[in-house]
Amino acid sequence: MYGTIARFRVRKDVNKEEFKQKMDEFGSAIIPGWIADYIFQTDANSNEYFLVALFKDKATYQANADSAEQHKRYLIFRSFLEDDPEWNDGTIVSATGPGSK
């Protein structure tokens, strides 16, 4: 598996429920190789978040990243943010738990 972990900050003037609703809408997209996205809101700062996106492999991750459809989704996502996300792409080397395989 392959994916990314992104750190980002939502603008303070953004309605958090509206942000969550828009992110949930992205879940209806049909994206080859896409497994899941998880978004965490930190306890320490309610405007700071982490996104974990999981794909079958690097090729499907890269195909999505290069797609026009993903670029449209990114622009909507970016409109909620203070600045550009910090992206950390990589290979998943371990996954544990009942739903991890």
Give the location of each predicted region.
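Short hydrophobic/aromatic beta-strand micro-patches
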Residues: 7-9, 52-54
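An amphipathic, aromatic/His-enriched active-site/gating alpha helix that lines ligand/cofactor pockets
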Residues: 25-36, 54-88
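Short, surface-exposed ligand-recognition loops at beta-strand->loop->(often short) alpha-helix junctions
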Residues: 9-20
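Residue-level signal for secondary-structure boundary sites
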Residues: 14-16, 59-61, 95
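Glycine-rich beta-strand-turn "strand-cap" elements at beta-sheet edges
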Residues: 2, 8-11, 36-47, 75-101
